[in-house]
């Protein structure tokens, strides 16, 4: 086993959409780095706490948000992981939706999600989104 210690990793300009890819000795892709992530407050005035490749969050309506990417992905065929924290005195359970027919379809430059309890959209204090492609 070897240890790789570097300060900078650069993409190969001939690579797919300028993405850093990890490959084995035969050149088979084993993975890529996270393309975008964000942690934001979805209550009151929406505010980004920390992010990578996210330019802004649009507060569409109660419990509905659009994450806008700083640099668009090559297409909308990415995987999204979303978590949220919602609590009130009567309902501790919530769910997250991002493939809801009531929401705007994902694009290469944005991703819309909703947080809710039962069938009602609710704002969440902590929402995290991770995008892989």
Segment roles from a protein language model:
Residues 85-133:
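Extracellular jelly-roll beta-sandwich "head" domains, especially the C-terminal globular C1q domain
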Residues 2-75, 116-133:
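Extracellular receptor-binding modules and their adjoining Ser/Thr/Gly/Asp/Asn-rich linkers
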């Amino acid at each position: 086993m070897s240890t790789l210690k570097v300060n900078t990793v650069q993409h190969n300009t001939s690579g797919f959409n300028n993405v850093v890819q990890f490959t084995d000795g035969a050149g088979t892709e084993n993975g890529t780095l996270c393309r975008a992530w964000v942690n934001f407050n979805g209550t009151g005035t929406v505010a980004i706490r920390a992010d990578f490749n996210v330019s802004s969050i649009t507060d569409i309506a109660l419990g509905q948000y659009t994450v806008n990417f700083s640099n668009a992905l090559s297409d909308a065929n990415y995987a999204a992981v979303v978590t949220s924290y919602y609590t009130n005195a009567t309902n501790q359970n919530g769910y997250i939706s991002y493939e809801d027919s009531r929401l705007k379809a994902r694009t290469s430059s944005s991703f819309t999600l909703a947080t809710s309890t039962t069938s009602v959209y609710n704002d969440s204090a902590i929402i995290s989104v991770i995008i892989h492609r």
